[in-house]
C-alpha cells in the first residue's frame, strides 16, 4: 500500500525491523531477526501464495477453532476487503469448518485518514462475522436478492450515519460483500463437500454470491430506495418477536 513498495501482508516485517533496531534484539519477543515464516498465512504474489493457498490456510485454522467450540458457541472475526475474491476464501474456511453465519454486522474499524487507505476509496468498515455450527438467525436478515439486501443495508447505513459516520462507496461495497458472503454460506452449507478441489469450492462460492446479488445490483437497488440519511432508526419487532421469527440451523 505504501506506493507499491510494501505489500500489506509484509507491513509487520517493515515495522518490526525498526522496532527491533530501537529496542534491541535482547528485548523479550524481539529475539528473532524477522517476522517472516515459511508457514505464514498471507496472500503474496511475489512469494507465489495465491487465493487458493490463502483459502486452504484459513480453512485449516477455522477447522481447528471450530473443533474447540462448544455446540452453538460463536466463532467471531472481523473482515473487510475491496475485492470479492477475498470473501471467497473466508467463506470457504467457514464452510469447511462445518459452520454457518448467524450474523454479519457492519462495524467502523479504521480511520479514513490512515496512510495506507487515504484516497484509495477503501472501506473503513469491517464486517463482524458471527459463525456457529447450530443456532438461530433472524428471518429478516436472510435476504435472497439485491432489493432485500438494500432494504437491510439502508437501515444499517442509517445507523452508521446517526453515529456520526459518513458511509462511502467503499464502505457500502464492503458491507454488501459481507452480507452476500453470509448468505452464500447459508445457502451452500446443506450441500457443501469439503473434499472437492479448492478451485471448485471457490468457484461455487463465487456463483452463489453472484446469484444473490452483485455489487452493481446492490448499488442500483440502494439508489432506487429511500435516501440513507432520512431513514429512521427503530426496531420493527421487540426481542421476543425477533426470536419467534428466527430460523434455526
Regions found by a protein language model. Give the residues of each.
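S-adenosyl-L-methionine-dependent nucleic acid methyltransferase catalytic domains
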Residues: 1-249
Amino acid at each position: 500500500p505504501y506506493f507499491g513498495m510494501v505489500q500489506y501482508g509484509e507491513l509487520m516485517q517493515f515495522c518490526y525491523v525498526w522496532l527491533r533496531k530501537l529496542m534491541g534484539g535482547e528485548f523479550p519477543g524481539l529475539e528473532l531477526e524477522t517476522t517472516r515464516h515459511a508457514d505464514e498465512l498471507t496472500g503474496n504474489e511475489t512469494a507465489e501464495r495465491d487465493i487458493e493457498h490463502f483459502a486452504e490456510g484459513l480453512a485449516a485454522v477455522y477447522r481447528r477453532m471450530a473443533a474447540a467450540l462448544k455446540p452453538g458457541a460463536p466463532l467471531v472475526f472481523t473482515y473487510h476487503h475491496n475485492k470479492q475474491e477475498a470473501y471467497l476464501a473466508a467463506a470457504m474456511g467457514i464452510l469447511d469448518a462445518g459452520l454457518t453465519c448467524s450474523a454479519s454486522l457492519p462495524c467502523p474499524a479504521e480511520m479514513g485518514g490512515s496512510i495506507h487507505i487515504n484516497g484509495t476509496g477503501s472501506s473503513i468498515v469491517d464486517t463482524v462475522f458471527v459463525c456457529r455450527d447450530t443456532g438461530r438467525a433472524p428471518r429478516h436478515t436472510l435476504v435472497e436478492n439485491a432489493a432485500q439486501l438494500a432494504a437491510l443495508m439502508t437501515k444499517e447505513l442509517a445507523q452508521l450515519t446517526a453515529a456520526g459516520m459518513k458511509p462511502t462507496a467503499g464502505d457500502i461495497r464492503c458491507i454488501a460483500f459481507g452480507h452476500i458472503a453470509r448468505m452464500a454460506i447459508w445457502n451452500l452449507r446443506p450441500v457443501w463437500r469439503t473434499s472437492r478441489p479448492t478451485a471448485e469450492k471457490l468457484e461455487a462460492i463465487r456463483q452463489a454470491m453472484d446469484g444473490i446479488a452483485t455489487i452493481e445490483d446492490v448499488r442500483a437497488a440502494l439508489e432506487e430506495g429511500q435516501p440513507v440519511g432520512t431513514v429512521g432508526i427503530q426496531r420493527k419487532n421487540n426481542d421476543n418477536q425477533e426470536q419467534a421469527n428466527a430460523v434455526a440451523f
